[in-house]
Amino acid sequence: MTGVASRRLHDPFVGPELDGTRWRFLEYPLADRTWVCREEGAETRVANGELTVRVARFRNAHPWHQNVDNCKHLLLASDTLPVAPTGRTTFGAEIRAESLGATPFDYRDGFVSFNVLDFDTGMVFDVCATSDRVFAIYERLPLPHVTDPFTYIVDAPLTGIAIAPGRWYACGVSFDPVARSAEWTVDGRRLFSAYDVRVPAAVTLGVGFITLHPVRDGRSHSLHGQGLAGGWRNVGVEYPVR
């Protein structure tokens, strides 16, 4: 009898409200307060297996904390999900994006993200989209306990992925602990592979809106009236056959 991979859905997105037992907003403790990565004007809808969020105009910004300035509106799964010690574990979601008032082809103005995060090591494995781009992020966050942070944006223009505003993309981030590798895919096509990776034992999934303009001269440069609309569905994990 042939084994079948085990697929687990994190949230069926039944609605009508977002399930607060499954999701929480990313928070950063600052000297004067706890910063919640949530756009107060966000229009959120949960129904028919989909989460949709629309922010007509970003408002969140920070003058010196780069991570806080980046994360405009970011939800994290309440529980971590383990990575199987052998075989290939794939974390996946379908995402769609429509940029609102953004500079064409400039992902820094804001993108829809599917995040696969390891907060123990600061490692980030994301698949992201705007109206006109789809790309991978490979990153080590500049957390207090992390050395040598980096951020790489990987655009693979020859993959042949059809890109259009509001189009659904099937995204995957796969880990193979034995091979020490990670792979990012969209619609079954490989965006990027990384090797000699410290594969996490468990990850936190996230969904949200992120900008990537550098903070400089004591102020944020991430706001110029732009916004973003996005959607997520089928957020979950597929474990290897046992």
Regions found by a protein language model. Name each.
Residues 13, 167-175, 182-184:
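Short tryptophan-centered beta-strand motifs in secreted/extracellular beta-sheet-rich domains
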Residues 1-38:
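Extracellular carbohydrate-recognition regions
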Residues 27, 32-146:
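Secretory/extracellular carbohydrate-interaction modules
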Residues 3-16, 55-63, 85-106, 144-147, ...:
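Ligand-recognition surfaces built from glycine- and aromatic
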Residues 128-130, 174-178:
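Short beta-strand micro-motifs enriched in acidic
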